[in-house]
A protein has these predicted regions:
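Structural signal for short hydrophobic segments within the conserved structured cores
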Residues: 50, 105, 133-135
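Conserved G1/Walker A P-loop phosphate-binding module
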Residues: 1-54
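Conserved catalytic network of the ASCE P-loop NTPase/AAA+ motor domain
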Residues: 7-9, 43-45, 70-74, 96-102
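Conserved nucleotide-sensing/catalytic segment adjacent to the nucleotide-binding pocket
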Residues: 39, 46-83
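A short acidic, amphipathic alpha-helical/loop segment
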Residues: 66-67, 90-95
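Conserved Switch II/interswitch segment of TRAFAC-class P-loop GTPases
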Residues: 59, 72-91, 101-118
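Canonical P-loop GTPase G-domain recognition
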Residues: 114-155
């Protein structure tokens, strides 16, 4: 192995968790510089070997939450994704505590469609869920995405 290869830091593997239409798949598309288009994630998708995109039903239906825990075992960082324009949240208090001490990062999506009050409410939802660092993002405008990628070392 060359010294250069040995000195490269391993890219982090992330899992995105959030309700249906929270913007998980669209955020993955933006991170990977793909054309943005909506499609419903039906099954767990592994994108570029380091992003795990989960169906919203895994969060929305309590019976599937065990699948989130099992799927998250392959991730280095948990991303809890909250749509800034949503009137509520699916994340119960201390939701992040079920991921065995893995870093839990809060991602607020659709910032381009939200006002400041909605963004602050989304931040509260994610903090209550146990998220540490928070990022305010828009897959449409790119707001916050470059910083997220750089900070989490996911590309």
């Amino acid at each position: 192995m060359s010294s250069q290869a040995g000195s490269e830091e391993k890219k982090k593997r992330i899992i995105l968790i959030g309700r249906s239409t929270a913007g998980k798949t669209t955020l993955c598309q933006r991170i990977n510089n793909e054309e943005l288009h909506y499609y419903k994630t039906q099954t767990v998708q592994v994108i570029n070997k380091n992003m795990i995109d989960t169906p919203g039903e895994y969060l929305e239906r309590r019976g599937f939450r065990g699948a989130l825990i099992v799927t998250s075992a392959d991730a280095d960082i948990i991303l809890v994704v909250q749509d800034a324009t949503a009137g509520g949240t699916m994340f119960p208090p201390l939701f992040c505590s079920m991921f065995a001490g893995k870093p839990c990062v809060g991602i607020i999506t659709k910032a381009d469609l939200a006002d400041e009050e909605q963004i602050q409410r989304a931040k509260k939802y994610l903090k209550d869920a146990g998220a540490g660092t928070l990022y305010v993002t828009s897959a449409v405008t790119g707001e916050g995405v470059e910083q997220l990628v750089r900070d989490l070392n996911i590309l």
